[in-house]
A protein has these predicted regions:
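Adenine nucleotide-associated cytosolic modules
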Residues: 1-183
Length: 183
């Protein structure tokens, strides 16, 4: 263990009123949340505070991640625009999450943070990395950045503060997953 690393825990709900203050003191943010509203909240706060971060998402046997560095590629909102409408995407409770997927994708996020912090290697800035555990295939997809239209990192931003969206959080779903018939 690195003796210079300090770990802080926060027993609080993170929302638009407190997220900017929470992330301000950190050098790199890792998004390990389980819902779209939280992902947009983290993205918007990181962009507004000029903080680099790694986004990740998992469901069933699939995962994805991307890294945002201010001024060096698209943010999460550039790629995904807005949270999907309620019921448009299955929740973790409906679809299930394989615990090992969190380990695989979380380890990749940790590597992104380490590379950024020590200044080595190529980050996933401008790319979306997807992983399918059923086929054991990774795909690195180049992402275009449309700075003219993004409402948070674009040339004329309209989102000037983080937004709280209605959210449904995964409840007690670790290890549950849909059967092959439901996929």
């Amino acid at each position: 263990m690195n003796p210079d690393v300090e770990v802080k825990t926060y027993r609080m709900f993170v929302d638009a009123s407190n997220i900017r203050g929470l992330i301000r003191e950190y050098d790199f943010i890792i998004d390990g949340t389980d819902n779209f509203p939280a992902k947009f909240l983290i993205n918007d706060a990181c962009v507004l505070e000029k903080k680099p971060f790694s986004h990740a998402g998992i469901i069933r046997f699939k995962g994805q991640l991307m890294t945002y560095v201010p001024g060096q590629g698209p943010c999460y909102r550039c790629v995904f625009k807005n949270p999907p409408p309620k019921d448009a995407v299955p929740t973790c409770k409906q679809a299930g999450v394989i615990g090992a997927m969190g380990g695989v994708i979380g380890s990749l996020q940790a590597m992104e943070a380490i590379k950024y912090l020590i200044g080595v290697g190529d980050l996933l800035t401008g790319y979306l990395l997807t992983y399918d555990a059923l086929t054991m295939e990774f795909h690195k997809i180049k992402l275009p950045k449309d700075t003219h239209k993004c409402p948070v990192c674009g040339d004329n931003p309209t989102i000037l503060e983080p937004i709280d969206y209605e959210q449904e959080i995964c409840e007690e779903t670790a290890g549950r997953f849909a059967t092959r018939d439901e996929q």
